[in-house]
């Protein structure tokens, strides 16, 4: 059976520097989590990203880091965002990656995000372990 871990941010003032994701919906949680026992890899990564569409154009980068990552940090593109043309527009995307990132059970891991241009975003990252 697969195990999933998710982290999110709402209204994050994202910048070109990586920021840890330390929420799960409305709850504040630790950005770092322990890789579950009896798993050996991250099999998929899902990223949902949205902005208000009022003039923000950027690409996002999600990083998985920590001493659980056997081959070092992994960075994934979130997909690009662009202006929708009105202040009431919306912009969102979803990407999913099939991966085989080796992890060390019992060690720690975290998700963080950076953007190519500063932007106010909502983001959810989910990793599936097996």
Where are these regions (language model features)?
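Extended extracellular/luminal ectodomain segments enriched in beta-structured repeat modules
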Residues: 37-45
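Beta-sandwich interaction modules
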Residues: 87-105
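Short amphipathic, basic-aromatic surface patches that mediate peripheral association
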Residues: 47-53
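Short, surface-exposed beta-strand/strand-loop-strand elements in extracellular ectodomains
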Residues: 55-72, 125
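Solvent-exposed serine/threonine-rich low-complexity stretches and specific carbohydrate-binding patches
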Residues: 8-14, 20, 72-87
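Tight coil/turn sites that cap or link beta-strands
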Residues: 26, 38, 87, 106-108
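Noncatalytic modules at the cell exterior or secretory-pathway interfaces
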Residues: 47, 100-117
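C-terminal interaction-tip segments
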Residues: 1-28, 32, 36-38, 52, ...
């Amino acid at each position: 059976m697969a195990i999933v871990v998710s982290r999110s941010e709402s209204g994050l003032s994202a910048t070109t520097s990586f920021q840890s994701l330390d929420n799960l919906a409305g709850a504040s949680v630790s950005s770092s989590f322990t890789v579950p026992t009896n798993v050996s890899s991250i099999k998929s990564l899902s990223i949902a990203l949205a902005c208000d569409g009022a003039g923000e154009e950027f690409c996002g980068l999600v990083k998985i880091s920590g001493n659980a990552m056997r081959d070092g940090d992994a960075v994934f593109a979130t997909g690009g965002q662009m202006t929708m043309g009105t202040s009431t527009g919306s912009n969102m995307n979803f990407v999913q990656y099939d991966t085989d990132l080796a992890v060390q059970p019992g060690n720690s891991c975290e998700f963080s995000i950076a953007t190519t241009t500063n932007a106010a975003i909502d983001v959810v990252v989910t990793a599936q372990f097996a």
